[in-house]
């Protein structure tokens, strides 16, 4: 006669197996996310999702895992740190001639690594419970990952809308819920270059640099171009300014180590990449999905924001006529360069960026 399943023991084993597979934290939650539905609907109604139509298309199913995968009783949420050693946050940000890539994208595409580990975790569980089914998701299904992570006890949602942990800050990929500990702090809201955090816990994606440089397929609105600075793929500012990230832990995963070609590279060199070279360098990287055209679009904006230099102007002019979308950003960037040359302008860093660099150098010296 088979013994009844000890769910408490199984939960402990799942967390142990997850740790053995390289996850820093493993939590288990139920599927009831109904409390998040009104906020999700209000966010969609305000069009804060921009061009990310899939968010509206799936509607409230994002808050109903049991409808997405009928029969689902529990969701396992995991945390994996991705902060690399020698992240060079400040060094890259304060040199406008270098390209800043969000630190999660410097190494191997996290989707693949995490999905493989989650699959192994699911298979381990099936060895103990053959009748159970599982499906691993890593940004691949329309579910609300952050509310699940909260319910699973991985942390709380900060005012920048990311999950925070007392022990690890927010530089990680997503039992009993954890109390919110942001208090009166609004550092992430005030540091955002484009004012994308429109109210606590609410991000207007249409203003977010990560959205503008990664998700947006068309032209970057002119009002945001000067504010993007040298950020050519994503932005980490709201995380870098967060006091909790003083406790962020370095990753143990070699796959998340920065690729040399993407770590603080000169903008002029990046802008010269052919599509074939772009595809070669970004193979297995999250960056590849935006394609060569949007990559060049982002770099053109950064070159426009860089100090006057004849080399910047020549680089921009060399790619005229390749594509209408790129031309729009090249012409804007050339105009910015000529304006600086004609005014003999001295490069002035934006106050928010200067403040951020000081905070990183003081509070995160190992990553500066």
Regions found by a protein language model. Name each.
Residues 296-307, 328-337:
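Structural detector for internal amphipathic alpha-helices that build alpha-solenoid repeat scaffolds
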Residues 277-281, 308-320, 340-350:
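Amphipathic alpha-helical scaffolding segments comprising HEAT/armadillo-like alpha-solenoid repeats
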Residues 289-294, 323-328:
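Alpha-helix N-cap/helix-start positions at coil->helix boundaries
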Residues 1-179, 345-368:
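Auxiliary alpha/beta "docking" domains used to position bulky ligands
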Residues 260-293, 300:
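Alpha-helical adaptor scaffolds
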Residues 23, 187-211, 217, 231-255:
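Iron-sulfur cluster-binding cysteine motifs and their immediate structural context
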Residues 159-160, 164-205:
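Loop-centered beta-sheet repeat module
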Residues 185, 209-223, 257-272:
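Short microdomains enriched in Cys/His and/or Lys/Arg
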């Amino acid at each position: 006669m088979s013994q009844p399943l000890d769910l408490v023991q199984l939960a402990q084993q799942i967390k142990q197996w997850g740790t053995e597979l390289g996850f820093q934290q493993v939590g288990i939650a139920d599927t009831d996310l109904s409390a998040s539905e009104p906020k999700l609907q209000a966010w969609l109604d305000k069009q804060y999702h921009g061009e990310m139509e899939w968010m509206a298309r799936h509607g409230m199913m994002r808050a109903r895992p049991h409808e997405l995968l009928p029969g689902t009783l529990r969701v396992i949420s995991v945390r994996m740190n991705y902060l690399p050693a020698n992240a060079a946050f400040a060094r890259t940000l304060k040199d406008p001639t270098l390209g800043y890539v969000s630190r999660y994208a410097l190494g191997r595409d996290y989707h693949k690594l995490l999905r493989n580990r989650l699959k192994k975790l699911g298979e381990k569980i099936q060895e103990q419970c053959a009748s159970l089914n599982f499906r691993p998701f890593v940004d691949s299904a329309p579910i609300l990952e952050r509310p699940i992570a909260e319910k699973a006890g991985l942390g709380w949602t900060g005012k920048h809308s990311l999950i925070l942990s007392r022990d690890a800050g927010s530089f990680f990929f997503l039992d009993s819920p954890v109390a919110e500990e942001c208090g009166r702090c609004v550092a992430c809201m005030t540091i955002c270059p484009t004012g994308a955090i429109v109210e606590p816990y609410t991000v207007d994606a249409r203003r977010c640099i990560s959205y503008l440089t990664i998700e947006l397929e068309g032209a970057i609105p002119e009002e945001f171009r000067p504010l993007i600075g040298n950020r050519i793929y994503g932005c980490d500012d709201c995380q870098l300014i967060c006091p909790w990230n003083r406790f962020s832990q370095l990753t143990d995963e070699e796959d998340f180590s920065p690729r040399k070609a993407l770590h603080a590279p000169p903008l002029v060199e990046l802008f010269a990449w052919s599509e074939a070279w772009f595809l070669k360098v970004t193979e297995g990287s999250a960056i590849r999905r935006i394609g060569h055209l949007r990559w060049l679009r982002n770099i053109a904006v950064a070159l426009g924001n860089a100090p006057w230099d004849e080399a910047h102007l020549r680089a921009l002019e060399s790619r005229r006529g390749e594509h209408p979308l790129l031309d729009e950003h090249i012409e804007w960037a050339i105009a910015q360069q000529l304006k600086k040359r004609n005014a003999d302008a001295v490069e002035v860093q934006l106050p928010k960026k200067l403040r951020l660099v000081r905070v990183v150098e003081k509070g995160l010296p190992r990553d500066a």
